[in-house]
Structure formats: structure tokens, C-alpha cells
């Protein structure tokens, strides 16, 4: 399995290793599992928000554009509707040869909850390529955490999909935000051996079979043991 994890998917068309995977037969499956339950709560919401015909609230083309720019044919893009698609159909779509599975932004805990709810974890583990954006970049790890922002009142740790161990990913990092540092400290106290990748917008990490093979505009934090619990920036804008 190869994972492309990023804060914003617009950078995908600039990642040569990603573009090299794509041809006219490449298929994209969008799993809209991350959205707030008041935003998408029924089949009609999926159809409306992912309508290919223009409407003020459709996010289909904005969601698909980075993949189309990277070379995917729009006709090869499928949006899963968990309210109408049966599980056998979803599993078939996810595991076809030459298929990219996309986990979009939103709420990472919702991704995990829905994948478990629809009994898709073993299927997800069989996927060849997964792209995770924002919330979707956090869910693949054994554990992930959120920190205080407009969506969360405070730090909170969640169990992830356990596709990758020994590390975790934090998107949309601005180094001037004091909450990210305190959240990193709290997480490292609980999980000392875990590497934390903090990606600015445009940053990404590529992981293949549990090994990091590519990194760009990402800060990596570790626990400094000899001087107590503190966070130290050890990699900055490594290309």
C-alpha cells in the first residue's frame, strides 16, 4: 500500500511520484465519510453535494480537480454513497486494479467510525493507493490527535485505522499556533516512540508499506529525552 498524505490535495499534480502512477485507465473512488453528520446525513445529500452538474453547493469538481489535473479521466471517478450502495459494491470499487482511494477533509474520527460501521477496514487494507487530505491524512494511523481550533474545544486523541504504526500526521500546521506545540507534547508523553509529521498547507508525506519514502514542507517532531519533555524541530522543509 502507498499513502499520499497532505494538508491540501491541490499539491498532488506537483508530486511526480503520484503523477507517474496515473494513466487513462486509473480510477478514483471518493469516500465521503469525513463530513459533519448535519452536512451529509442521507443519500440525497451525497447526490446534491457531489452533483456533476453545476449547483451552488456542489463540491464534486473542486474535490476532483487535483486528480483530474494529475491525469485522471473524470469518467473514471466514483463517489461512494453509503446510504444506497451495498457493501459488496463498495468493496468491489475500492479494490479494483489501478484504483486510487481518496479520503477527503472534514472530521477524521468520522472516517474511522464509518469505515468500521460499514465493515470496510479489511477492504481498505487491500487498497493499492490511498490519498488522504486534511482529516483524511490523519485517519490511516494507529492513533491521531486534534488540537484546539474552530472545530475542537481542546486536545483529543483518537484511535485510527492502524494502517501505519509508529507515526502520526497533523495537517494545516502554522508554527505560530501555540496549541499545536502543547498538543504535540501531550501526545508524545503518551506515545514516546511516535514520530509526528506536521504539514503546512502544500506539505505532504508519502508512505509505502509503513516506510516514509518522500517528504516535503513537513516539520517532524521527536521527544528530547535527555532534557525532559520538549518538542524539537528536527526536519524543516526537507525536499
Name what the model sees in each region.
Residues 72-129:
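Flexible gly/pro-rich beta->alpha loop and the following alpha-helix that scaffold active-site loops
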Residues 1-24, 30-57, 146, 150-239:
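C-terminal and late-domain segments of enzyme folds
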Residues 38, 52-91:
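Class I S-adenosyl-L-methionine
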Residues 34-36, 106-108, 136:
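Short glycine-rich anion-binding loops that position phosphate/pyrophosphate groups of nucleotides
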Residues 19, 64, 91-92, 117-124, ...:
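Short amphipathic alpha-helical segments and helix-helix/interface helices
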Residues 29, 100-104, 131-132, 169-170:
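Structural motif
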Residues 110-116, 120-176:
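Class I SAM-dependent methyltransferase SAM-binding "motif I" and its flanking Rossmann-like core
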Residues 5, 78-79, 102-103, 131-133, ...:
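General beta-strand structural signal in soluble alpha/beta enzymes
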